[in-house]
Amino acid sequence: MSKFKSLLLLFGTLILLSGCSNIEIFNAKGPVASSQKFLILYSIVFMLVICFVVLGMFAIFIYKYSYNKNAESGKMHHNAIIETIWFVIPIIIVAALAIPTVKTLYDYEKPPKSEKDPMVVYAVSAGYKWFFAYPDEHIETVNTLTIPKDRPVVFKLQAMDTMTSFWIPQLGGQKYAMTGMTMNWTLEASQTGTFRGRNSNFNGEGFSRQTFKVNAVSQKDYDKWVKEVKGKKTLDQDTFDKQLLPSTPNKALEFNGTHMAFVDPAADPEYIFYAYKRFNFELKDPNFTSEENMFKDVSDKPLIPARKAQITNANYKRHGMKLMILGNDEPYNNEFKKDESKNAKEMKKISKDAQDQDNDDHGGGH
């Protein structure tokens, strides 16, 4: 067998083997992911049909109108029917792709329809880790998430250092978590199982390890798990601050109590820098620092007292937004949720005003 044929066979085998992998976005385990799967497959099939039609016509025209000795030069002239066809068909194609896409994107912003009330989980990214605070249950986990199946989960996304992207491929698409604000993202697991979650936004040398495990369980098993976690160590501020450091190893942890008892990351984006200071942690460029010197001077214990809850976000101060602190013995009730909603509406208004101002500055709003 020639070298070319061997390479061709090897290449063909690799293509076939790629179909054996478990592509997570096509292995949907929730309603949001299922609608995304349909949209992707619909778009692929639709565009393949267009490609086959265009390439088929291309082949026919090459064969039928190829040059030969008896060929006559064609005479170009106006044809209203043909011009209408090649003007209308692209519009139909764009509409057929755009309408379901836009509709699906707007549907993502609404919680999936369910008879059960949605539960709330604060998903906070920091130090190349994910922190999950359960305000109703007053428990917190690190790099692991447990949710009941068939119940919508409203994730309140926050970032304490760099911008990240929260993504559980088998449950739905990604959404950004940014400093100084809270973004809502609702997902639901329709089956029990263990899924992978990750930060899909490249944001530094620790990006690849910012992953977490998602356990979707029955409501009975979820209640049992919550009871077990409540019996574990209570999360104190020293422990939380140390976990914020990129130098602290990424491990799956579970705590009684939450960080919401002493910090609101959206209201206090400067909190993490104080945590760095407490443990003498300094950000260093990995390109110019040896591995042994990256975290050489980091203290194992805090050197200064813990920071009190406060507002350092200028937007919070300017617009009278409230500091959201929930003690471990305080209920996550309608009064707290009302203040949450008020902050969210104010932040949305700030974002819209900034966008309008940007449009005015660049002429995009006219």
UniProtKB/Swiss-Prot annotation:
It is an enzyme of class 1 (oxidoreductase). GO terms for cellular component: plasma membrane. It comes from the Bacteria. The keyword Glycoprotein does not apply. Its EC number is 1.10.3.-. Pfam families: COX2_TM. The keyword Lyase does not apply. Its main location: membrane. Disulfide bonds: none annotated. Residues 335-366 have a biased composition (Basic and acidic residues). Keywords: Cell membrane, Electron transport, Lipoprotein, Membrane, Oxidoreductase, Palmitate, Respiratory chain, Signal, Transmembrane, Transmembrane helix, Transport. GO terms for molecular function: copper ion binding; cytochrome bo3 ubiquinol oxidase activity; cytochrome-c oxidase activity; oxidoreductase activity, acting on diphenols and related substances as donors, oxygen as acceptor. It is a multi-pass membrane protein. One of its GO terms (biological process) is ATP synthesis coupled electron transport. Residues 330-366 are annotated as: Disordered. It is found in: Cell membrane. Catalyzes quinol oxidation with the concomitant reduction of oxygen to water. Subunit II transfers the electrons from a quinol to the binuclear center of the catalytic subunit I. Belongs to the cytochrome c oxidase subunit 2 family. This is Probable quinol oxidase subunit 2. It comes from Staphylococcus aureus (strain NCTC 8325 / PS 47). The lineage of its organism: Bacteria, Bacillati, Bacillota, Bacilli, Bacillales. The gene is qoxA.
